[in-house]
């Protein structure tokens, strides 16, 4: 299992994570064994947004023997009221719910204290001067949470968090279908029966979010990586074709700042399906050819950083160069952080010999040689 640095937290998290929301469906012992099995496969980061006692108890039992080997995303503001999940900022519920999380997880600290589920810009702005945020800061100051994170499905809100200076990582919904969707405060638009057929390529607000995370060294962990399983079924997929878990995971891992994918598991076989990413061939990871040939929703002409353009006669890392170009051109001037990352590349865009061999391999018809010229001009090398 490979690990990635989770932005400014400096935590080395496994590329495949554990999304715990399905644990309550199964007998307690079975779910505890599933956590143990995931750990044996090298998974070391787990998301617990669930407020129900059963899920929290299962996780507590599942991690108690090796708590120090796990990084826990624990959500602040996810509460259990009248036998139901209730998202709130009311401190009479927030504080006891978080204390309950610590108790049931049998721990005195949470690695990643998550500002839970903010999808409205107005709510994000209101939270900045609130008793709720004072509590989050108190938890950080006293070491009860080691780092501050935030979860959102709205790229505009997530971008504000990334630029806040105190949010160190973000749990965000990423997959090739959601990346086409415009920003919305309504999560239901992500799971509509039909996608707008006019949507093409990566939505600009999502691209801006990825750029902001890259610039501010804010790591991303991914939820909804499989779009609730829709992407596995060609009849339900907005592309009209099916993708595999490995292809979905690889798509997410080719987005800037992404460090880990929080997958939900019912069985050990599903853990194996996700962990298979670590030993998958380039052909097995190849989401690009599938999407490029899909009957719906085109990414034509847009680089998705899939790497199909390799190998390059001049040894350019074309996908990475394109990524830096896209991030840089979203601002009037090239950000210093993006420039410094680009300058660390061993081979620069100016070394492109214009053979266009890469273009014959690109499934999306990206004019790569032309983009190398533009990149060399933009960065001056």
Residue ranges, per PLM feature:
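Short cysteine clusters
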Residues: 303-312, 352-358, 362
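Active-site groove signature of glycoside hydrolases
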Residues: 100-123
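Active-site mouth loops of central-metabolism enzymes
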Residues: 19-29, 79-95, 233-242
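Conserved, mostly hydrophobic/aromatic
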Residues: 6, 18, 46, 59, ...
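N-terminal binding-site loop/beta-alpha segment at the start of enzyme catalytic domains
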Residues: 1-74, 108, 141
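Short, acidic/polar
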Residues: 26-38, 89-106, 152-160, 243-251
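Acidic-and-aromatic substrate-binding clefts and catalytic sites of carbohydrate-active enzymes
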Residues: 23-29, 47-57, 80-81, 89, ...
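Beta/alpha (TIM)-barrel catalytic core signal, keyed to glycine-rich beta->alpha loops juxtaposed to Asp/Glu
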Residues: 118-320, 330-344, 370
């Amino acid at each position: 299992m490979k690990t990635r640095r989770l932005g400014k937290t400096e935590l080395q998290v496994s590329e495949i994570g554990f999304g715990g929301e399905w644990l309550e469906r199964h007998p307690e012992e079975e779910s505890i064994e599933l956590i143990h099995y995931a750990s044996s496969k090298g998974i070391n980061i787990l998301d617990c947004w669930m407020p129900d006692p059963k899920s929290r108890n299962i996780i507590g039992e599942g991690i108690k023997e090796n708590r120090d080997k796990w990084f826990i995303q624990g959500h602040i503001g996810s509460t259990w009221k009248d036998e139901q999940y209730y998202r709130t900022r009311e401190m009479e519920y927030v504080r006891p719910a978080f204390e309950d999380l610590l108790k049931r997880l049998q721990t005195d600290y949470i690695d990643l204290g998550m500002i839970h589920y903010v999808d409205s810009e107005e709510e994000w702005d209101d939270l900045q001067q609130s008793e709720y945020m004072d509590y989050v800061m108190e938890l950080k100051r006293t070491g009860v949470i080691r780092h501050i994170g935030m979860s959102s499905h709205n790229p505009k809100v997530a971008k504000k968090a990334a630029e806040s200076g105190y949010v160190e990582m973000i749990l965000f919904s990423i997959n090739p279908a959601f990346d086409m969707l415009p920003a919305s405060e309504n999560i239901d638009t992500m799971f509509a029966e039909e996608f707008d057929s006019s949507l093409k390529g990566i939505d600009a607000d999502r691209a801006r979010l990825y750029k902001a995370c890259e610039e501010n060294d804010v790591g991303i962990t991914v939820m909804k990586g499989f779009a609730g399983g829709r992407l596995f079924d060609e009849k339900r997929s907005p592309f009209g074709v099916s993708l595999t878990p490995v292809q979905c995971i690889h798509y997410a891992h080719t987005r800037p700042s992404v460090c880990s994918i929080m997958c939900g598991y019912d069985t050990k076989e599903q853990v194996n399906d996700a962990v298979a990413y670590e030993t998958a061939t380039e052909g097995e990871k190849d989401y690009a050819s599938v999407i490029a040939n899909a009957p719906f929703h085109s990414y034509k002409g847009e680089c998705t950083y899939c790497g199909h353009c390799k190998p390059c006669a001049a040894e350019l890392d074309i996908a990475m160069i394109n990524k830096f170009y896209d991030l840089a051109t979203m601002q009037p001037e090239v950000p210093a952080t993006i420039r410094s990352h680009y300058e660390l590349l061993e081979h620069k865009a100016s070394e492109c010999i214009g053979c266009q061999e890469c273009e014959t391999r690109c499934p999306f018809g990206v004019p790569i040689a032309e983009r190398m010229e533009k990149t060399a001009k933009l960065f001056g090398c």
